[in-house]
Amino acid sequence: RPTMLQDPKWMEYTIHDSDGYYSAPLKFALEPDENGCVTLTLSGVNEPVALDSLTLTACHTNPSYEEYLERLKNSGASLEEGKDVVQIEGENTVNTSTNVVYPVEDRSDALTSPIDTSRTMLNTIGTEKWETAGQWIRYRFSVNSSGMYEIYSRFKQSYLDGMYVCRTLKIYTNGYESEDAYKAAFGNTAGYYDGVPFEEATQLRFDYNNAWQVKGLSKGGNKDETYPLYFEEGVTYTLHFEVALGSMSELVRQIESILNSLNDDYLSIIKLTGSSPDDYRDYSFTRLLPNTMLDMLEQSVALGQVSDFLKKDTVGVASSYTGICDKLQTLLEKMGRDENAIAKNLDNFKSYVGSFGTFLTDSKTQPLQIDYFRIQGASVKKPKAKANFFRAIGHEVSSFVMSFFRDYNSMGSMDTGETTKESINVW
């Protein structure tokens, strides 16, 4: 794998929630003191950083996609379909936010680009390396024809069973310091971008499937609406894709709240019963722990809401995560209504809460594997996600035959220009 180097540079950053629970920039209510001043204190936690300036601005809201289209119409630019087709290989990033995000090999499908059965090719990027809120990758491109373009991605999201992951798209126009400078050059501002183009781009959705998929920029839902964008001929653009919880953030907050309540309920119970309760003893839970009994019923209802959300608003089917919610919901309702069932089911309660905690951890991650992005007009045929039967068979046969000729001893070696004259003995 090629060596990744740090590229220190000045960057503008708007303060966000580092856990990704809130996708919008954080807002602060500031009140000046008697001297009309506001004091801000920054405390270092880890890693060195240089600050040039801090800027306080009024709260900004992103326009909707409909408002974005209206701005394009009012700008005077032609909104005809673009004629160019640009394919950006996922592994060919300009920058990544961390050296953990790097190209990886995939030979599972003949349509993965590029593909070579005789060699190891780092032909995709992402997987579980690109899953933490705030991690980003960047690409640069330009088109040879001004107009509206769809952005398709070939991706695989086979990591979160029955759930989807989200990404935030930001676009930057390179070479123009301001919108006015761009307008002076082109006579309109249609192709100028400086961040999130519209609100829907903050929660682009990639659904679960074991196979490769091809999809345009979409927020998901029943309509699965895509969002064509305007690009100007000859202008260099930067695409910035960032991991975000998106519409999953509210669900994650609810899951964490439920888990905290259930942990408190469990501690309340074992304070009375000990870690190994007697199944035949009357602990008088209703009299001694009425709030705990009530809370278990309340959390049972909340778990039902989580399960319904996963079944209806994700991929529409049950999964291992909905199974955890359904089992825990049934158990909580049983324990909350019948105090005699608490001691008998305490071990199951502990086990289910542990599994639910794993669910919370998984929900915070957003793994995604990218093969390529393709920028093309709406009338151009959509790229295929999977190879047909004959091409797939040919790929598998070729992979099998070439496995006898691959030099596995040289895999991973790189010529850096350095030579070693001495050898060492390893024992």
Language model features with spans:
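A short, compositionally biased domain-edge/stem linker segment
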Residues: 71-81, 400-417
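Short, well-ordered beta-strand elements
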Residues: 414-427
